[in-house]
From Swiss-Prot:
May function in recognizing stalled ribosomes, interact with stem-loop structures in stalled mRNA molecules, and effect endonucleolytic cleavage of the mRNA. May play a role in the release non-functional ribosomes and degradation of damaged mRNAs. Has endoribonuclease activity. Its main location: cytoplasm. The keyword DNA repair does not apply. Monomer. It comes from Thermococcus kodakarensis (strain ATCC BAA-918 / JCM 12380 / KOD1). Its EC number is 3.1.-.-. It is an enzyme of class 3 (hydrolase). Pfam families: eRF1_1 (PF03463), eRF1_2 (PF03464), eRF1_3 (PF03465). This is Protein pelota homolog. InterPro entries: eFR1_2_sf, eRF1_1_Pelota, eRF1_2, eRF1_3, Pelota/DOM34_N, Pelota_arc, Ribosomal_eL30-like_sf, Transl-rel_pelota. The gene is pelA. It is found in: Cytoplasm. GO terms for biological process: nonfunctional rRNA decay; nuclear-transcribed mRNA catabolic process, no-go decay; nuclear-transcribed mRNA catabolic process, non-stop decay; ribosome disassembly; RNA surveillance. One of its GO terms (molecular function) is metal ion binding. Disulfide bonds: none annotated.
């Protein structure tokens, strides 16, 4: 994401959304009541004379819409902001009528807030920093099967699954030929995805020796791709293997600033502390609020959905209190396994400096 202009006195920030991740950030930055300005298309009835029917035209116009509904449409690659029009660049567009602004990759949008809160500013900074980082690709590979995923800012996107029937014994000539075809398919797919998505690193993992064989193959046949590959172990294959790579901190080691890896690891730490019953964790609104009041929270985990729901104001108060006591606040995406686990805990959890009970 690019910040094009800032007007602090007016509470306005003008940005350009460049990636799907930027749309995810904007979905969490824009709140009900904010005014969103952008170029858009609007159907407008054009008056005709008494002999001809009224004609509807689609006109380009610059509008300001006061947000009432904000929806993230991942598969359409859009954030849709719906609300009454409060500003229009054309006099023939009536104010007060409802309109939906569709924010896509490449859209320039101005967001005006009565007050920019700390978590809004943090997410905006994150989005700008993330635009300078490459994403990470994960490939979990074993005999004749490879599962691929991209680790994005908003979560894990499962990509291609490649399956080849390699036949019988490991050192059979036909099997070796089929394995070479399989390796070529995986390598070509990796090249395509990494080029398209601007990925600098790929983690190739798996439970057996196939990953090492594949890496040797890459060094011989695809040397440039091999330079971007890191080899790791997993205990399983498939999607479970992909999430194992993330949980074990492999992504974090490969690309330390990756948001998803940090979120998943923190949720896992919460679950570990719960299992140990060591008193250094709180979860659910009541427990977390008590820990915040004691100044005991070292890290507060907040599910992103709570910042769009009825508890938003209460949760924001807790976030501000934790920051005031020099704690860390991490907003966890609901789009990955860690977010699902946090949701099961009520959407709020805290790692504590000391026991409060």
């Amino acid at each position: 994401m690019q910040i094009l202009e800032e007007k602090p006195k007016e509470g306005k920030v003008k940005v350009k959304a460049e990636t799907l991740d930027d749309l995810w950030h904007l979905y969490h930055i824009i709140d009900p009541g904010d005014i969103v300005y952008a170029k858009t298309l609007r159907k407008q009835a054009q008056r005709a004379d008494s002999l001809r029917a009224e004609k509807v035209e689609v006109i380009p116009v610059f509008l300001g819409v006061q947000a009432e509904k904000i929806n993230f449409h991942k598969f359409a690659n859009q954030v849709r902001v719906t609300g009454p029009i409060v500003y229009a660049s054309r006099e023939d567009v009536p104010l007060g009528k409802y309109h939906t602004i569709a924010i896509e990759q490449g859209t320039v949008v101005t967001i005006q807030k009565p007050r920019w809160k700390e978590h809004h500013i943090e997410r905006l900074k994150e989005a700008v920093a993330a635009s300078k980082r490459a994403r990470v690709m994960i490939v979990v590979i074993d005999d004749g099967e490879a599962d691929m995923a991209l680790v994005r800012e908003y979560g894990v996107e499962i990509l291609n699954s490649i399956r080849h029937n390699l036949g019988g014994k490991r050192y059979n000539t036909d099997r070796e030929s089929e394995e070479m075809k399989f390796f070529h398919d995986v390598a070509k797919t990796m090249e395509e995805v990494m080029k398209r998505e601007n990925v600098e690193k790929a983690i190739v993992a798996g439970p057996g020796f196939v990953k090492e064989d594949f890496y040797k193959f890459l060094k011989e046949k695809y040397p440039e791709l091999a330079k971007k590959v890191v080899i790791e172990d997993t205990s399983v294959t498939g999607r479970t293997g992909i999430y194992e790579v993330i949980k074990r901190g492999v992504v974090d080691r490969v690309y330390q600033e990756n948001r998803v890896a940090k979120e998943v690891q923190l949720v896992e730490k919460v679950l570990e502390n719960i299992a140990r019953n060591n008193g250094l964790v709180a979860y659910g609104l009541k427990e977390v609020e008590e820990a915040v009041n004691y100044g005991a929270v070292e890290t507060l985990l907040v599910l992103d959905e709570l910042l769009k729901g009825e508890l938003r104001e209460k949760v924001e108060e807790l976030m501000d209190a934790v920051r005031y006591s020099r704690g860390e606040v991490v907003v966890v995406s609901s789009e990955h396994e860690g977010g699902e686990k946090l949701k099961a805990l009520g959407g709020l959890a805290a790692l504590l400096r000391f026991r409060v009970k």
